[in-house]
UniProtKB/Swiss-Prot annotation:
Name used for this protein in its record: Phosphatidylserine decarboxylase proenzyme
Cofactor binding annotation: Binds 1 pyruvoyl group covalently per subunit.
Principal subcellular localisation of the protein: membrane
Membrane topology: Peripheral membrane protein
Keyword Nucleotide-binding recorded: no
Pathway terms, separated by semicolons: Phospholipid metabolism; phosphatidylethanolamine biosynthesis; phosphatidylethanolamine from CDP-diacylglycerol: step 2/2
Top-level division of the source organism's lineage: Bacteria
Lineage: Bacteria, Pseudomonadati, Chlorobiota, Chlorobiia, Chlorobiales
UniProt-listed Enzyme Commission number(s): 4.1.1.65
Single annotated GO MF: phosphatidylserine decarboxylase activity
Catalytic activity entry: a 1,2-diacyl-sn-glycero-3-phospho-L-serine + H(+) = a 1,2-diacyl-sn-glycero-3-phosphoethanolamine + CO2
Cellular location(s): Cell membrane
Length: 212
C-alpha cells in the first residue's frame, strides 16, 4: 500500500526515469544499461519510501502510541508551554529507510497547530528540536494534554500535516508525513509514565510509548 501523500513525488520520479532512459536510448546508447538500472533503482526506492503498511493500534486504553516509525533518540524531562512543567520529551528519529507516514498518538481534539520556519540541521542533533523547521501539534482530551512536533532535517525538507484546528482525531489514524527522514518529538505531562527508553525502535500507531 502506498500513501497518497507520495503520489506527486512518485509521478515525478516515474517521469524522470522515463525521460532519462529515453534520452540515453536516443543520444547515448552505450550508457542505456546504466541509465535503465539507475532509473529502476530510483523508482523502486521512491515506491519503497512511500509505502504505508496497515497498522492495528493495540487494545490498551489510557496509552500514548508512537506517532512515527524509528528509533528513540532520547527521553528527558522538559518544561513545555502546552503540557506544563516537569513534562517528559520522547524524541523519535526516522531514517530514510523507515516508514514515514505519521499517526495520531491519542484520541482527542486538536487544540494547537502551529508551523515554525527554521533551519535544517541534522535530525539527530538535539539542537534541531529548537532551531529546525517544525509543525507543532497539541491534542487534548479529558485526561491529558499531549504535545508533539514534526521536525524537519537536513534531507527532510517537506513536512505534510493534514490536521485542522478543532478536529476530532483517533489514535492510530494517519495525519501526515515528513519526506526523507527526520524526527518527531512527543512531550507528555508530568502524570504520564513513559514506557520506552533511548535506543528502542517504534512503529507508528502500534508501539506504546507512555501510559496514563
Amino acid at each position: 500500500m502506498l500513501t497518497p501523500y507520495g503520489y506527486p513525488t512518485i509521478l515525478k520520479t516515474a517521469c524522470i526515469a522515463i525521460l532519462l532512459s529515453g534520452a540515453a536510448h536516443l543520444f547515448a546508447k552505450p550508457l542505456l544499461p546504466e541509465a535503465l538500472i539507475f532509473s529502476v533503482f530510483l523508482l523502486l526506492f521512491t515506491l519503497y519510501f512511500f509505502r504505508d503498511p496497515i497498522r492495528t493500534p493495540p487494545d490498551k486504553k489510557r496509552t500514548v502510541l508512537a506517532p512515527a516509525d524509528g528509533k528513540v533518540l532520547l527521553v528527558k524531562p522538559v518544561n513545555n508551554h502546552f503540557t506544563g512543567p516537569s513534562s517528559t520529551l520522547v524524541s523519535i528519529f526516522m531514517s530514510p529507510f523507515n516508514v514515514h507516514v505519521n499517526r495520531i498518538p491519542v484520541d482527542g481534539t486538536v487544540t494547537l497547530l502551529s508551523y515554525h520556519q527554521g533551519t535544517f540541521m541534522m535530525a539527530f542533533d538535539h539542537r534541531s528540536l529548537e532551531s529546525n523547521e517544525k509543525m507543532e501539534i497539541g491534542i487534548e482530551n479529558k485526561e491529558l494534554k499531549l504535545h508533539f512536533s514534526q521536525v524537519s532535517g537536513f534531507l527532510a525538507r517537506r513536512i505534510i500535516c493534514s490536521l485542522q484546528q478543532g478536529e476530532q482525531v483517533e489514535r492510530g489514524k494517519r495525519f501526515g508525513m515528513i519526506r526523507f527522514g527526520s524526527r518527531v518529538d512527543v512531550i507528555v505531562p508530568a502524570h504520564v509514565e513513559v514506557t520506552v527508553k533511548a535506543g528502542q525502535h517504534t512503529k507508528a500507531g502500534e508501539t506504546v510509548i507512555a501510559r496514563f
